[in-house]
């Protein structure tokens, strides 16, 4: 959620910044509601002061043994009723303002380019595209040759967009997850296994709700409204809520977490023919990294997360590139995002395996996640950051395709061999 004071005090600057992401925003109605709200709050404060003064007078009269005139009690009752009336009238105003503010995306950082994917910029490329002296196979064919993935039975069990890992497919998948987990533990991140079913407030704090509430798998009969529960689309949705409604100590920051979960996605639209196999599905495994930091530390934290994700891909020996996303290609909650994209030879494309993002204080405002400065005792919002570390459903196809030999065998990345038990499949 954006800072209302910033919108009020520098409306044009906020409008201009948001134009990088969305169409022009008209703040007229919001500012009008804000004026009403502030006037009502002022009236309530004046009446509360009058009530306090009347209560003090009653106490003084009683302490001196005097008799309190009934008019005092009548006045206090009238003031209390008026306060209650004004506070009731504040509720719909606040509701309208919250609805408006919750629909706004985060303000992009100044160094983020406007527009969509067409303005994404490649920062650097790691390694060379693999060159084959034979006709390379795609990951679906290689999976079939080695009996790694059962797409047919996955569809039978759950429908399109699902698959079954089997044999060395399951072993490779588990090896990847173990490799990622081991590296994050070495780096001092705390391991979290969160619930997979979350409440509405989790989606709202993350910035995914209310806009995207129909793009998740809902659970049970409470499918609508704030009583709904849903299956997490990413562990970020859980991790950003760990400290919701909390005030942290300054010396507790930064807090560094990572979580393993399957991710469940209701994808809009149809898949491209080239995105068959594991490239896009309704369920996939992912390790998610997350940090809570002080505002002045979040830029360095983003660099750390990017570096960690890149190190994992480098460790696997995969060719990839790092791209900085333009504003409209960043998710609504994020001020800045970098994507790590691995090369998929059969598609002649790079596909994202990690997004590393800085939400600044956008999610913290929604979830009331704050910290107290040790020196000033001032309470401020934390900054929140996340990065995939990594998503396996793109990594495994990249390994199969980039590491294949002419005979269809697959070279197992060295970092995975202690779990796989083989150098080659």
From Swiss-Prot:
It is found in: Cytoplasm. Pathway: Aminoacyl-tRNA biosynthesis; selenocysteinyl-tRNA(Sec) biosynthesis; L-seryl-tRNA(Sec) from L-serine and tRNA(Sec): step 1/1. InterPro entries: aa-tRNA-synt_IIb, aa-tRNA-synth_II, aa-tRNA-synth_II/BPL/LPL, Ser-tRNA-ligase_type_1, Ser-tRNA-synth_1_N, SerRS_1_N_sf, tRNA-bd_arm. One of its GO terms (biological process) is seryl-tRNA aminoacylation. Its EC number is 6.1.1.11. GO terms for molecular function: ATP binding; catalytic activity, acting on a protein; serine-tRNA ligase activity; transferase activity. It comes from the Bacteria. One of its GO terms (cellular component) is cytoplasm. ATP binds at residues 265-267, 352-355. The keyword Transmembrane helix does not apply. Belongs to the class-II aminoacyl-tRNA synthetase family. Type-1 seryl-tRNA synthetase subfamily. Catalyzes the attachment of serine to tRNA(Ser). Is also able to aminoacylate tRNA(Sec) with serine, to form the misacylated tRNA L-seryl-tRNA(Sec), which will be further converted into selenocysteinyl-tRNA(Sec). Consists of two distinct domains, a catalytic core and a N-terminal extension that is involved in tRNA binding. This is Serine--tRNA ligase 2. The gene is serS2.
């Amino acid at each position: 959620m954006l800072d209302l004071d910033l919108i009020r005090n520098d409306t044009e600057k906020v409008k201009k910044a948001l134009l990088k992401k969305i169409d022009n925003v008209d703040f007229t109605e919001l500012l009008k509601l804000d004026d009403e709200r502030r006037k009502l709050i002022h009236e309530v404060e004046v009446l509360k002061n009058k009530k306090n003064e009347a209560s003090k007078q009653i106490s003084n009269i009683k302490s001196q043994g005097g008799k309190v005139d009934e008019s005092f009690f009548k006045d206090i009752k009238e003031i209390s009723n008026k306060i209650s009336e004004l506070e009731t009238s504040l509720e719909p105003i606040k509701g309208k303002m919250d609805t408006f503010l919750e629909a706004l995306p985060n303000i992009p950082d100044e160094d983020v380019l406007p527009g969509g994917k067409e303005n994404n910029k490649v920062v650097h490329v790691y390694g060379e595209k693999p060159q084959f002296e034979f006709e390379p196979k795609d990951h679906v064919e290689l999976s079939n040759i080695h009996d790694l993935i059962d797409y047919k039975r996955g569809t039978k069990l759950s429908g399109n967009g699902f698959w079954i890992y089997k044999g060395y497919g399951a072993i490779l998948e588990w090896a990847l997850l173990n490799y990622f987990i081991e590296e994050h533990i070495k780096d001092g991140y705390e391991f979290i296994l969160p619930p997979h079913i979350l409440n509405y407030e989790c989606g709202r704090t993350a910035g995914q709700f209310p806009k995207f509430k129909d793009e998740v798998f809902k659970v049970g009969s409470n499918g609508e409204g704030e009583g709904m529960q849903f299956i997490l689309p990413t562990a970020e949705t859980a991790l950003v809520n760990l400290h919701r409604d909390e005030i942290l100590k300054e010396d507790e920051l930064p807090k560094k977490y990572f979580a393993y979960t399957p991710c469940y996605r209701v994808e809009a639209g149809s898949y491209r023919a080239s995105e068959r196999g594991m490239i896009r599905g309704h369920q996939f495994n992912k390790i998610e990294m997350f940090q809570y930091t002080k505002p002045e530390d979040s830029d360095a934290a983003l660099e750390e997360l990017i570096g960690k994700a890149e190190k994992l891909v480098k460790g696997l020996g995969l060719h990839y590139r790092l791209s900085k996303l333009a504003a409209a290609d960043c998710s609504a909650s994020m001020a800045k995002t970098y994507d790590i994209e691995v090369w998929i030879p059969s598609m002649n494309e790079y596909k994202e395996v990690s997004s590393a993002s800085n939400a600044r204080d956008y999610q913290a405002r929604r979830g009331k996640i704050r910290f107290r400065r040790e020196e000033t005792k001032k309470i401020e919002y934390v900054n929140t950051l996340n990065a995939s570390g990594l998503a396996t459903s793109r990594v495994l196809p990249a390994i199969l395709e980039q590491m294949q030999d002419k005979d269809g065998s697959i070279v197992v990345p060295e970092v995975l061999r202690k779990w796989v038990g083989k150098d080659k499949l």
